[in-house]
Amino acid sequence: MEYVLETNGLTKRYRNCTVLDHLSIHVPKGAIYGFVGRNGAGKTTLIRLICGLQEPTGGSYSIYGIRNDTSKILRSRRRIGAVVESPSIYLDMTAAENICQQYRILGIPSESGVQPLLRLVGLENTGRKKAKNFSLGMRQRLGIAVALAGNPDFLVLDEPVNGLDPQGIVEIRELILKLNREYGITVFISSHILDELARLATHYGFIDAGHI
């Protein structure tokens, strides 16, 4: 079986606080992996590590078979799209402008890709409306669109339905299923809401106080 993400004894400490304690998980290619735990259990810390935003204290992880302690890990990380903690969007920009900005950051020609991405996440009719006037669900979908701008194989979502109303939750759920089933994207979802993950996940990891 091919694994998109593997962690082996992964550990993260802050002074005297151990947030991740010898964590070992395996995320198969093509899976929707639900990473379940209460707030403060270490879910976001793991995501920040695999996205390269922080360094582990001990252990290792691999993305598409490339270990984090090799120079090739940067190439593997380019296959990840992520929404960490909150959507990385510019509130004074429209949805289209946000996606264009991400294309510029990535150095990708943007003209042909903006509208397909907007249609994919259901924001094609937002026009000149700025993101600051979007609902929370719309902002979350825009954040996912921005994460998809680099055409990733692996999508990492940190609490994607947190704070959303029932309709917003359904829209995110349907989008995740579409990305996985129609586009073949492996999805890693952290959440403290097991009931919602049960509607999505093909595989699970349960974390408590840094332990699986």
Language model feature labels by segment:
Residues 155-159:
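Catalytic Walker B motif of ABC-type/P-loop ATPase nucleotide-binding domains
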Residues 170-183:
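Helical segment within the ABC ATPase nucleotide-binding domain
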